[in-house]
Amino acid sequence: MAKYFDVHPENPQPRSIGQIADAVRSGALIAYPTDSCYALGCRLGSRDGIDRIRSIRRLDHRHHFTLMCRDFAQLGQFVRVDNDVFRAVKASTPGSYTFILPATREVPRMLQHPKKKTVGVRIPDHVVTQALLAELGEPLLSSTLLLPDEEEPLTQGWEIKDRLDHVVDAVVDSGDCGTEPTTVVDFSGGEAEIVRRGAGDTSRFE
């Protein structure tokens, strides 16, 4: 059964955040809220976590996983960003955007796109997620919690606990969450290519 953490949306309890971070460090797969919608997350490089996310969402090997980063300094450790792209990404973070960029050697090969050697990165504008990332001290490997054959992500922590109780290790609930995933922008070719229109405004990239 998954552990259930009821976390205050504006003033996250340090004890709960610490317990969630400890669980992630120990290999747990968690469901947690973001500024766009709920996500599945595990420790960077957790083969078991990656396999479980693929199984829950029925993803193939071409799926771009996302590294949920605390800030731009951390993001820069895992992707290569030239000056023009830097300005565009910097102006849009934190926020509901995922950027696909060339991966550095810090990113395990199993997380990189098999041909492009890219990875998704983002910096969330969400108090609870930021508290968890600060406590964890490293990015969370993440994927939108969108179940197969469903059009929208789940929005309520209790519903996620009820439906995924035996396939995730912890559920973080900080109240109602959105249903719209991030806007995905691919900068791996140098120019902005909008891969998915979502919660983030796309006009600045068009």
Please identify what each model-predicted range represents:
Residues M1-E206:
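Active-site-adjacent structural elements in enzyme catalytic cores
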